Curated annotation (Swiss-Prot):
Residues 1-63, 243-275, 434-470 are annotated as: Disordered. Belongs to the EXO84 family. SUPFAM superfamilies: Cullin repeat-like, PH domain-like. It is found in: Cytoplasmic vesicle, Secretory vesicle. Gene3D superfamilies: Exo84p, C-terminal helical domain, Exo84p, N-terminal helical domain, Pleckstrin-homology domain (PH domain)/Phosphotyrosine-binding domain (PTB). The gene is EXO84. GO terms for cellular component: exocyst; transport vesicle. Involved in the secretory pathway as part of the exocyst complex which tethers secretory vesicles to the sites of exocytosis. Plays a role in both the assembly of the exocyst and the polarization of this complex to specific sites of the plasma membrane for exocytosis. Also involved in assembly of the spliceosome. Component of the exocyst complex. Residues 168-252 form a coiled coil. This is Exocyst complex component EXO84. Keywords: Coiled coil, Cytoplasmic vesicle, Exocytosis, Isopeptide bond, Protein transport, Transport, Ubl conjugation. Residues 37-58 have a biased composition (Basic and acidic residues). Residues 26-36, 243-252, 434-447 have a biased composition (Polar residues).
Amino acid sequence: MVDFSLKKHGVSSWGRGSLSRKESSAGDSSSTFKSSRYQDMKVSDPELPKVSAKERSKAGTMMKRRLSVHQSNNFGAVKMDFDNMPALPSSAADYSFASNVGNATQTSLITEDQLPDRNTSLASLNTNTRRPDQELYSSKSLRQILSNPDFKAKKFITEKLGDATAVDIDQFTSNLNDLSLEIQDEIKFNIDKSFKEILIVNKGLETATTELKVLRTKVQEMKDIMNQFVTIAEKKLQAEQAANETADLNRTSSSASLSNHSLLPPLKPTPSATRKDRTSVYILERMWNEELMTLFKNVDGAHKYITSTPGRHILLESDNWIEINPATLKPLQKVRLFILNDVVLIAAPKPSKQTELTVSRFSPLRDVTVEVQSEHELSFNFSNKQHTLYRHRDPQVFSKVIDIIRQAKDALREISQAEEDTTRKIRNSYTLLQQERTPNRDATTSPVKVHGRQRSYGGTGTPSRHRSDAQNDALLTNITRSIHVRMGSEETTEVTKRLKRLDDALEDLDLEIGRQNFDLAITKLNHIQSSLKSLYSSATFDESVMVELLSLKCSQRKTILYTKLTNLLACETSDMTKLKSYMLNLVALNEPVDALEVFLQNRSNFINDLTLQIGIIDNVTSFITQVAIIRFQTLKKVTQQYLEVSKNLKRDYTSLLVCWCSEEVDKHFQLMERELSNSSTLSVQAIKITRKQIDELKPVGMDYVYKLDDFIRRNNNRIL
């Protein structure tokens, strides 16, 4: 501890100290005054010792303790005795003057000539022993000095701190320590800032890496799609080029045939030109197969239930569904729904590995009944009488799953209906072919016999033949050509020219029949028949034979038209516009009875098909209600259709319609009695709905309320 107090020193001691200093200064006046105590030191620049930050901090703390003054809590103002204190020199001149006076009183060895030199030495001492500038003590100045690349520590200490006091050195050390702490704080701050920036950059790099991976996948998919587009475009260009070549070839052949008057038909296009481009179908099937392969990879055991059949594909994959216990309504497990176009697969996590999926439920879509239990719950009823309940929080996903399942069921229903229609058409076609191959068959027999219904009226009595239509057609063609050759050798008359034109018109008629332009074909046929009748009276013998042959060919075309129209009328089930058109065409062929009979038989089959689609229902009232609506609404539409067609009829065939409607009503009540035999009672609601449907027939002129009254009278005791 440094004691700065002056109380222990008296005036005498201060004076003696001053005289001793004067004597020493007088004794040394002959020697050169040194401005610095380190002036004569000739030492090479040594390497400064390396002091750690901890030691520098410790040294600074020790210096502070040396220079500290401890004061008590009850410290008061210090009473200083200024009378016993010597007067201090105010400047260098006063100091030199006081020194000269003291030396003069002590010794006479110093002369006045030596005073100027001493004053000069004192002045130089005053100049060299100045304190360092206060600016050196600031952190900013020290930072600039130490950051200079040409900084030399020994030179700086010698020049700036050579004559510094302990207080100045301590202050300088404290400033260095503070600067060191500031630099350490800045280093820590910069490290922390750099670390945060590195974390941000790493996060950005991670995001960029993920996006690049996704982008790479998207780019690869885009390349595949572009390759597919290129393939499709090339196929289309090839098809267009082939079509153009075919058109040029047809044009050339047609021009050649016109120039040569050839009877050969134009050249047909090659199969490659007419073949449809199925590239898009192949691409779609490949995408579906890839989706199925992904399903097999992600769901363990899925390949055991689902096979990669053509056309099978995934419609929807929905996650985050919860299976609920129907009894306790508690969650059981998390599941994922896979809705395919024909099956439903439900996958759940494995007990050992929650990240892997395994098959939990599987069933064909036709055997699954989906019911909405609440806004977020779905109930799946499987064919094996299993009942499961699933819940999802998102209402949009919930609605989407329901819509996809309904659309898939509707598509399956349409496919089944189309398959049934195709099977029915094939069966009817086989039946008609078998009937056509039977010898001694009336050519105009209605196909209603195929369906088990006997005709009530006869047709146009054309003679029966033992040959098939193809043989007859070939025979008539050969005979016609021979007659044409015979008539061509003679003089050509106007009747002969007209007969040739009519023969050519019959050839064109075959094209219209093949294209199913029945209206135009029937119009041409009637025109040809009327023209032949007008030519028969003025024709010669050979020309009359030609007229008879052309009449036979017209009858043959009429038979072909009749067969095609009755077949189409018997097979069509849904399009009422086509049914009406076929009926009108048959009426134009003078076959109104067969047209009406085939149409009525078609509607009977339609009612039976709709009744079978209802299926087995435990509720008798619901079943009777649906059957009544189907049957009586069909009767109403058939009656309205007949009233529209009857405007073109020369006779009234309402009796056929009335008999058919009566039979259908009897079938309905027979069905109700059969249901009564299975069930003990019948509700009044079914009777009311049946009565309402019967009343709707009254506006079209049909009243069968009496049949309902007879049924109620017979089964009054079983109606509740």
